[in-house]
Structure formats: C-alpha cells, structure tokens
C-alpha cells in the first residue's frame, strides 16, 4: 500500500449493518440514486448559501448534478459542483455509521415493515451506503470550495475504507459506483432518466444524464407549486396534472397556494374532471405526493383522509426531515398540522363551488359516494361535509341538498325522511313512498353503497333528525290524506293476529299501517334497530343481530279487506303469500320461489275459472 493511502476501520458492527442495507432493501434498491442525488443537490444548495458571504464559493453558471453511466468500465458516476468535502469531512461524514446509531439502525431495520425500510436509511444518516446495494466498490473524490486539496475515499463495503490525496479541477464531489453484475439496468440512460423523473424531477438543481457522450437534461428543475399562481398558465397546470396521475381530462378544480407562518408548505392539488379508471372503492388511501424541499419522499403519507382520496397533487414542505419512515411520519406533529390545513382547504373549495349547482353536479356524480364516507369517518368535519351532499328526491327533479330539503319541509314536519335501497330506479316506485307522497312529504332517495351507514352517524341536520322511512314508529297521522278514505274492515285485528301466528319467527311483528295507499303490504324495521337496508347488508355478510322485519298491512286495500272476511283456514297460505309479496316489493326473493310461483299460478287459474 502506498504511504499516502490511509486505511480506517468503520467499527465492529458496520459489516452487519452494510449487510442489512444491501439485503433488507434489495427490492427497493433503486432508491440509491435518490439518496445520492439528494446529497448532491443539498451540497450545491449549501455552496450557494455559503457564496452569499464568500465569493470563493460561488457556483459556476453551468453547475449541475451529472449522472454518467460507463458500460465499458461498468461504472456509474454521480458528480456535483457542491460545497465539497475536506479529508476530515470525508472521514466524518462517510464514517459516521461507526459512531452514530449503528446498533439502533440495525435493530430498527430488522424489525421494520418492508415498505418502511427504504426511508429508514436516510433517517439514520446512512443513505450514502445504499450505494452498496448496487455496487461492490464505491469511490468518492471531493474538493472543498475554497480549498486546493482533493481527497478520495474508497470502500468495498466490507467494514473499512481508505483515504488518499487526489486531484479535482473544481470544487465538488464525484461518486463512482463500480456496479455489481446484476445491476446492469443502472448503466442504461433511459432507466436513469426514469428514476430522476420519479424521485427528483422538481428539485431546482439541474440534473443531467449522459447519453452518447452528451449531457441531457433529466429533470424539470422548476417546482410548479413553488411559483406564484400569477406565474403559472392554465396549460402548465394541465400539463402537470396529466403528468402526476396519468390523467387525460381537464381538472375540475385546481388548488394552488402557499401556507406561511408557524407552518410553511406549498400545495398544488387537483380534483379530476372524471372518475379514474381504477375503482376508488378498492383503493382507499390518498395518493397526494409529499415532497420535502422539492425532493419526492412518498405518496403514502396520507396527506388527505380517505374520503378525499380522489384529490391528486403535491404538498412540499421544509418543516419535515428529508428522510423519515412512514411510521414516524404518522406521528409527526408538523405533518398532522399539514394534513389538517390541506383537508380544510379542499373542503373550503368544495363549499365555494357547491354554490354553482350546475358545475357542482359533475363533481358529485363522479365523487359523491366517496365524499359521503366523511360523514361516518370524520367526526370533526361532519358538519362541514353534510351541506356538500346531494341526493335524488321524491319531490323534485335532479339533485337536492339537505339545506334545500329543510327549506321545503311542511309545517309540523319534524324529521328529514330518507329511503335507502340498492337500485336507484326501484326507489322511485317503492311502496314505502306511497303514504309520504300522498301527504306531500318529501323523501330523500339514497342508493350509493355507503348510504346504509352514514345517516345514523350524522343523526341530525339543522336540528332535524334524519329518519329512515323503513323504520317502524313513524306517525304520519298529523298529515291528512287527500280525499275520503275507506274505513278499516271489521275483523282486521283478528286477521292481523292470525297472520302473525301463521308467520311465527319469520317476522318480528305484524301490524296495520297508514303509510300505504296503493299497496297491500310492506316490510319495515323495528323502531330501535337498523333499518331494512342495513338488516339486508348484515344478512348478506352473515352477521348476527340483523333481526326479522315487521310486516305492515294496509287495512283499506281491497285484497286485505277480502282476506279479513275469508275463512280462518285460508289465513296460513295467505300470510305466506303476503310476506313474499312484501319481500319482492323490497327487492328480495320469495322465501320459496317455486312454491310462490305455484300459488300465483293457482290464483290466476281460479280467477279465470279454470
């Protein structure tokens, strides 16, 4: 060994640590380039800052981060014109793992979830060592700005490194990776281009990838969200929107602002103009990208709640460390404040745009079911979300809102009535609506998959309770029906009791009702439990506690009047048929379809005198 080459040992645990970095992160090893580029960009920012007080540190006009693959030599070189390092800096900065949390890093990396491991290497200050995931030897040649000396640090990742004098024409750093046999992809300029766009597209430092001996720009270099709104054109907004989410439409809304004060961040968010191809029902996590100092960190920071997961875009802050695990992100107070602020801004935008009924309609038809989830997921914002909801109605065409419904309530009406079913078209002809329509009472018609859940969570709106009309205990007697109504037949009480006996445990009760006009029977739920739609969902899921429905009978219907006067021996078969009719009206099948078909056929034959 030359006398000018110094050999240093990392420390007893470093061999194990490097082994962990290389093997535990193998599937995510592309992040090595993110780490090296982030370090290079930071070095150039530091030099730019130092130049404010030292002319000797001024950056050259063409300063950039340069990524140069060499297929013949099988090397990848990342160069920068940054602040550079002295011999002592190299020993300290690239040797810190010997004395700064090696054991803690090793233990944390071993116990961390696979998806959190990539960010841990930066969190513990060992991001540089991710280079050994793709290289079996790494050399770093650096010259500190303001110094004439350059030094080369070299290691094979086996627990030791060397330092020796070197030459470098200008201040800055060259990191040369001697690539492993299975790392050929990082010799391809197109692959390097892709990684730069993925991880560092918007950092302000220019990044070039060398292709056929020429430097080609690989990043935009301008963070659009960092610009003032007045400096950005609609075309630029659209181009960025298309690039971040593979969108081909125009955004329905663009939100661009900068928060300043105790918490500082920039945000550029988009609400799409159409539903995405992938189902929002299957993917419930927000994918807004988190950047720290323009460097992409993750799109899994859950910057927005699941009920706003249709929003796309970027939030960039300097109030978070550049590298932090997702697990630690969730408990970071600064991130919690960012989430609250960003969520509030999106809700405020929706509130403003909801005043334009026609414009808001397209948003609602695309993302309404997702927004409804906020009612039962976000107690704090429930009151802000409720006025944004839109519904079909038994009384008006098109969409209506809860405030509009309340403004149309009849004198003496105390509740907001709604009906939930799977089929929007079936709702309009549901017998559940007959008594309400006949009395001029409006009912909201709900058919989204979330509608069985949120009304009970909201409870009230503007002091008015929300009531499912399929629940028992609704008293409509204060609202008179138009026209003269026939009296209930004699013997109706005995008939109802006989039907209840005949059906037994298949129903929880049988009773007369004033909610029907044209139909003979209808199902309802008990007043204290879940409504019919929730009971139906519980049965489909095999959950206990769904209970049995109540069979309500219209005593003024011709069929019921006739059955009430029929011999008692006919009640058991009639009771089963009435229950099947009610089930069919409610969107369910008869208990025994074949038996029901025979009953109907026999009744038709009898009616024809056959």
UniProtKB/Swiss-Prot annotation:
Keyword Chaperone: yes
Keywords annotated in UniProt: ATP-binding, Chaperone, Cytoplasm, Nucleotide-binding, Stress response
Region (C): 537-610
Pfam family membership, one: HSP90
Keyword Cytoplasm: yes
Gene3D superfamilies (UniProt xref): 3.30.230.80, 3.40.50.11260, Heat shock protein 90, C-terminal domain, Histidine kinase-like ATPase, C-terminal domain
Principal location class: cytoplasm
Domain of life of the organism encoding this protein: Bacteria
Chain residue ranges for the region called A: 1-326
UniProt-annotated stretches for the region B: 327-536
SMART domains: HATPase_c
Complexes and interactors: Homodimer.
UniProt similarity note: Belongs to the heat shock protein 90 family.
Function field: Molecular chaperone. Has ATPase activity.
Protein name (Swiss-Prot/TrEMBL): Chaperone protein HtpG
UniProt organism field: Methylobacterium radiotolerans (strain ATCC 27329 / DSM 1819 / JCM 2831 / NBRC 15690 / NCIMB 10815 / 0-1)
């Amino acid at each position: 060994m030359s006398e000018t080459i110094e050999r240093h040992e990392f420390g007893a645990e470093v061999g194990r640590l490097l082994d962990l970095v290389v093997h535990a992160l193998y599937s995510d090893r592309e992040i090595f380039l993110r780490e090296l580029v982030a370090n290079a960009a930071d070095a150039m920012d530091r030099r730019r800052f130092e130049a404010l007080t030292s002319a000797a540190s001024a950056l050259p006009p063409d300063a950039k981060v340069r990524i140069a693959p060499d297929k013949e030599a099988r090397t990848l070189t990342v160069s920068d014109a940054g602040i550079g390092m002295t011999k002592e800096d190299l020993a300290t900065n690239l040797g810190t793992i010997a004395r700064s949390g090696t054991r803690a890093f090793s233990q944390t990396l071993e116990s961390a979830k696979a998806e959190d491991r990539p960010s841990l290497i930066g969190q513990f200050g060992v991001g540089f060592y991710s280079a050994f995931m793709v290289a079996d030897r790494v050399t770093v040649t650096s010259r500190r700005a303001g110094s004439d000396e350059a030094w080369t640090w070299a290691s094979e990742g086996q627990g030791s490194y060397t330092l020796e004098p070197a030459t470098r024409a200008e201040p800055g750093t060259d990191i040369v990776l001697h690539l492993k046999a299975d790392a050929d992809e990082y010799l391809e300029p197109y692959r390097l281009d892709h990684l730069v766009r993925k991880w560092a597209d918007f950092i302000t430092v220019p990044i070039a990838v060398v292709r056929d001996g020429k430097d080609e720009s690989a990043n935009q270099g301008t963070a659009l969200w960092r610009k003032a709104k007045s400096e950005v054109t609609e075309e630029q907004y659209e181009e960025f929107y298309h690039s971040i989410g593979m969108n081909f439409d125009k955004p329905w809304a663009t939100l661009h602002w900068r928060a300043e004060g105790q918490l500082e961040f920039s945000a550029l968010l988009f609400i799409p103009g159409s539903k995405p191809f992938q189902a929002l029902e299957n993917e419930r996590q927000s994918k807004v990208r988190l950047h720290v100092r323009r460097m992409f960190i993750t799109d899994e920071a859950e910057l927005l709640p699941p009920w706003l997961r249709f929003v796309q875009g970027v939030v960039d802050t300097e109030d978070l460390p550049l590298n932090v695990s997702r697990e630690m992100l969730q408990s970071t107070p600064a991130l919690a404040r960012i989430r609250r602020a960003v969520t509030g801004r999106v809700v405020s935008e929706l509130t403003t745009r909801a005043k334009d009924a026609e414009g808001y309609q397209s948003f609602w038809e695309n993302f309404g079911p997702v927004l409804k989830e906020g009612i039962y997921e976000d107690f704090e914002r429930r009151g802000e979300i409720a006025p944004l909801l839109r519904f079909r109605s038994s009384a008006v065409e098109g969409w209506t809102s809860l405030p509009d419904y309340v403004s149309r309530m009849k004198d003496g009406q105390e509740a907001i009535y709604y009906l939930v079913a799977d089929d929007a078209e079936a709702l309009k002809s549901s017998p559940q609506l007959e008594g309400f329509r006949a009395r001029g009472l409006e009912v909201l018609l709900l058919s989204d998959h979330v509608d069985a859940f949120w009304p009970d969570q909201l409870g009230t709106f503007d002091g008015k309770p929300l009531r499912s009309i399929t629940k028992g205990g609704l008293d409509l007697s204060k609202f008179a029906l138009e026209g003269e109504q026939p009296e209930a037949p004699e013997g109706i009480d005995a008939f109802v009791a006989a039907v209840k006996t005949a059906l037994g445990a298949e129903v929880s009760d049988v009773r007369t009702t004033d909610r029907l006009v044209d139909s003979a029977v209808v199902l309802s739920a008990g007043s204290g439990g879940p409504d019919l739609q929730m009971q139906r969902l519980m049965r489909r899921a095999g959950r206990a506690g769904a209970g049995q429905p109540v069979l309500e009978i219209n005593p003024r219907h011709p069929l019921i009047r006739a059955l009430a006067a029929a011999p008692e021996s006919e009640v058991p078969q009639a009771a089963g048929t009435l229950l099947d009719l009610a089930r069919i009206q409610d969107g369910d099948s008869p208990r025994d379809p074949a038996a029901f078909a025979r009953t109907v056929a026999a009744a038709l034959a009898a009616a024809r005198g056959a």
